[in-house]
Amino acid sequence: MATLRVLLSCVRGPLRPPVRCPAWRPFASGANFEYIIAEKRGKNNTVGLIQLNRPKALNALCDGLIDELNQALKIFEEDPAVGAIVLTGGDKAFAAGADIKEMQNLSFQDCYSSKFLKHWDHLTQIKKPVIAAVNGYAFGGGCELAMMCDIIYAGEKAQFAQPEILIGTIPGAGGTQRLTRTVGKSLAMEMVLTGDRISAQDAKQAGLVSKICPVETLVEEAIQCAEKIASNSKIIAAMAKESVNAAFEMTLAEGSKLEKKLFYSTFATNDRKEGMTAFVEKRKANFKDQ
């Protein structure tokens, strides 16, 4: 949640502007974003791509950036052509934490009455699968933001940390909860109590990351995964996502009961019938998201 001066000091040389691939298709939403870039990608524009774009601040998560992120997520969630979303940052940083300047002078009353950081939770309410493509620093709020996503791909030089204790606070956007559920108590406790960072390789070994990619191909590989997801039925993908996420909230018995209920629910969809019929007929399924 914190952007630390000591972390910023480790970056040498001028920051490069975000690299924009010529193949990226413009995001025709009418939205005018200052802190993010939002575009549709994939052969059939089935992937929503959101790039955090505050390079001089290492993508520090100010209120304006989070508001724009939520706007873009809402637009992609409501776009029937989009089946999955990729969230990324820059080569130096996915996001180096929350914007400390916005938090420095807040009181308890300010935080409590305004439900500070509450609007960060919008990402967890998105029904479409979201992939975090993490290059560079994912510290504090940046690590928490990545953990809100459904899948994390990491560049080979990515680093993850919850260093809030070094500035006299604790994670406030799910860091102590999601990290513990993902990597276990011992590693989570060590990271939260020391502020130490872990590498992409350590994160993968701990189960925080599902794939490590070269820095230069990370986003494209995440998009390829998103395209594969988007080729399936959106309504069935949403059910699958709901069932997997329930494993973090329920007992095994409760989760299995929900899974069974969602499994039965697929039999009320045309896509379930089409998928099984296509399998029997040895052809590719033509899902209609119905």
Curated annotation (Swiss-Prot):
An example Gene Ontology biological process: fatty acid beta-oxidation
Modified residues (Phosphoserine): S114
Catalysed transformations (reactions): a (3S)-3-hydroxyacyl-CoA = a (2E)-enoyl-CoA + H2O; a (3E)-enoyl-CoA = a 4-saturated (2E)-enoyl-CoA; (3E)-hexenoyl-CoA = (2E)-hexenoyl-CoA; (3S)-3-hydroxybutanoyl-CoA = (2E)-butenoyl-CoA + H2O
Modification N6-succinyllysine, positions: K101, K115, K204
The entry's keywords: Acetylation, Fatty acid metabolism, Isomerase, Lipid metabolism, Lyase, Mitochondrion, Phosphoprotein, Transit peptide
Keyword Transit peptide: yes
Molecular function via GO: 3-hydroxypropionyl-CoA dehydratase activity; crotonyl-CoA hydratase activity; delta(3)-delta(2)-enoyl-CoA isomerase activity; enoyl-CoA hydratase activity
Site location (Important for catalytic activity): E164
Function: Converts unsaturated trans-2-enoyl-CoA species ((2E)-enoyl-CoA) to the corresponding (3S)-3-hydroxyacyl-CoA species through addition of a water molecule to the double bond. Catalyzes the hydration of medium- and short-chained fatty enoyl-CoA thioesters from 4 carbons long (C4) up to C16. Has high substrate specificity for crotonyl-CoA ((2E)-butenoyl-CoA) and moderate specificity for acryloyl-CoA, 3-methylcrotonyl-CoA (3-methyl-(2E)-butenoyl-CoA) and methacrylyl-CoA ((2E)-2-methylpropenoyl-CoA). Can bind tiglyl-CoA (2-methylcrotonoyl-CoA), but hydrates only a small amount of this substrate.
UniProt-recorded name of the protein: Enoyl-CoA hydratase, mitochondrial
